[in-house]
Amino acid sequence: MKPTITSWADEVEADYVDGLPPSKEHVDGDYKHVTEYKFNDEGKKIKVVRSFKIEKKIVSRAVAKRRNWTKFGDSKLDKPGPNSYTTKVADEILMNYMGSKDFEHTQDPLDASKPIAKCRICNGEHWSVKCPYKGTSMDIESKAIAAATAAVGETNKAGKYVPPFLKEGGKGRERDDSSAVRISNLSESMTEDDLEELVKKIGPHTKMYLAREKNSGLCKGFAYVHFKYRKDAAEAIEILNGHGYDHLILSVEWSKPQN
């Protein structure tokens, strides 16, 4: 049988099906140099030479096993390692650099140190709808004071009723904190359920308030508990003050009246 005689042009065309020479790799010590050919946006053939530093490191067994997985899809015939045509090692991050003048215009006109929200019930740094005292006696008192204050503006009109606690420049009834205690040095992970578990065995309580950070929602480190009876509040101070809880030493004292 006679050997088939082929043209050298056919052999070249078979090697370079897409008109580009195959990529080449050259290892020089700890560096690997990869030479590739491709077409740019203008349709011109260009040569791209990339250099990689070879590093050996110890990885977990799961990572080593994952690197031996069989490639599929467009990367089915690729060599080990990422292919720049089908794989992105990292996400592209676009950055816009601003000048000093542009930065001044973007400054928030509001003072960042001042709270944006203020509760009308307890004057805390949160919205009234999220107040822990909503629906309690404190909420009822605040609504009564607001309604009575509006009525004071019309005291000159005959027949208008003014509550006794607002007459003669009165500032309203003070909240009864005689059976309230302040628990401080709490951990950031403290929750209302943890606080309930901490004080429920001492005695019945009417309400609790766990102070939280406005942005993160973590505990600020203190809380208030209003016991039903003053003797239970005194017992809570005696039991919990200096008590170790969540790797911290609690400090419990009588709640001081607000000015």
Curated annotation (Swiss-Prot):
Main location: cytoplasm
Subcellular localization(s) per the UniProt record: Cytoplasm
GO biological process entries: formation of cytoplasmic translation initiation complex
Cellular component terms per the entry's GO annotation: eukaryotic 43S preinitiation complex; eukaryotic 48S preinitiation complex; eukaryotic translation initiation factor 3 complex
Pfam families registered for this protein in UniProt: eIF3g, RRM_1
InterPro entries named among the record's database cross-references: eIF3_g, eIF3g_N, eIF3G_RRM, Nucleotide-bd_a/b_plait_sf, RBD_domain_sf, RRM_dom
PROSITE patterns hit by this protein: RRM (PS50102)
Signal peptide: none
Domain RRM residue range list: 179-257
Keywords, alphabetical: Cytoplasm, Initiation factor, Protein biosynthesis, RNA-binding
GO molecular function: RNA binding; translation initiation factor activity
Family membership: Belongs to the eIF-3 subunit G family.
PANTHER family: EUKARYOTIC TRANSLATION INITIATION FACTOR 3 SUBUNIT G (PTHR10352)
Function: RNA-binding component of the eukaryotic translation initiation factor 3 (eIF-3) complex, which is involved in protein synthesis of a specialized repertoire of mRNAs and, together with other initiation factors, stimulates binding of mRNA and methionyl-tRNAi to the 40S ribosome. The eIF-3 complex specifically targets and initiates translation of a subset of mRNAs involved in cell proliferation. This subunit can bind 18S rRNA.
HAMAP family: eIF3g
Subunit-level organization: Component of the eukaryotic translation initiation factor 3 (eIF-3) complex. The eIF-3 complex interacts with pix.
Protein name, as recorded: Eukaryotic translation initiation factor 3 subunit G-2
Organism: Drosophila mojavensis
Gene label: eIF3g2
